[in-house]
């Protein structure tokens, strides 16, 4: 297996819900430009005990995994362990992990455990990492578990007694906009619309719609459309819609902690409340003024379109800042998403990495050393700097580092940190958007984006759409 083997499919993933109360999570791992001297602290204390072992890591196509695949030598030098990394679209990863675990095999020892599509439905196939954390024969987790953001959301299911993954990445949906175009047209836009159009949490979703429509009608010489969306019939559509659903004060279920530790029994869906119906009606209206190719774009398609100058603004995952800075250097601004009748809600898409419980003997120990190293502060900083990656740290201590804080302003050698102000605001409890972490989410997710696709195609009205979703949710969950 080639170390950088990839499967065709979408880059970057879906994801979104993490824990707030326990510390929200940021994400990413670290490796770019990493040298043996930048290894995890405590090197030489238990790192070589599985030397000669080979392990396989299966991951979604993500920035941190790309960075580590490009530079895993520091880990191999530190441990003597060879790691093969396979990257692919999330939906393909889910199927491969299911087959591996259900078959009692461990072709993949380390697993990218998306909280909704892997961790919740397959938690029984993952090793409880507490056994390694509490065993002194292994190097300690640097700075301890308390340093992780969103440990519950990314690493646990149903209970805090078991830990299935360590937070690895944390893409979060924010408002990306062409700062240069807003600067150019601000006065004219403000005069026409009657409000200051500067992107911020003070702008409502209704005003966002008006801004998009204004660009469509008044700025064609500079940009084809005002807004773009990841509205393909795919998980990305559910992600995009969820921001609006939560902003309007609605949700999928009414269960405490369902977005953090999750639940096996979410009960009846709450998708037919007046707030949910209003959210669907607004989203349907918004897509009518969006770039028409929005219905063909997932997050990666949208990211490429924004970087190519096709839209003036969009809601997208903050890790696309690195791409923006390459294509539109100095021309992009970032804010939390607009506010609905209830709040601003910003989808959190963090994920942890865990260990296949089918792995045997030295494979388990070697896999843990990789999980520990890949989520360490030093590795996350290296990933931030990587030309191949550019991850999103999941450690509080990383955000407190002077060099990382400096990178929040241009010129920056860590372009994803240019979003820090918006992202840290998005992670506040009142602003974060957390999907329900339930074992049936793969089925529910499909129900959401299938019905939404019918709605935005004009074959199903918003009220019928939400009623259909709710009915199908309840049928799946019994």
What are the functions of these language-model segments?
Residues 42-47, 115-174, 240, 333-335, ...:
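Hinge/lid segment of periplasmic solute-binding proteins
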Residues 62-82, 180, 448:
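Short, polar/charged alpha-helical segment
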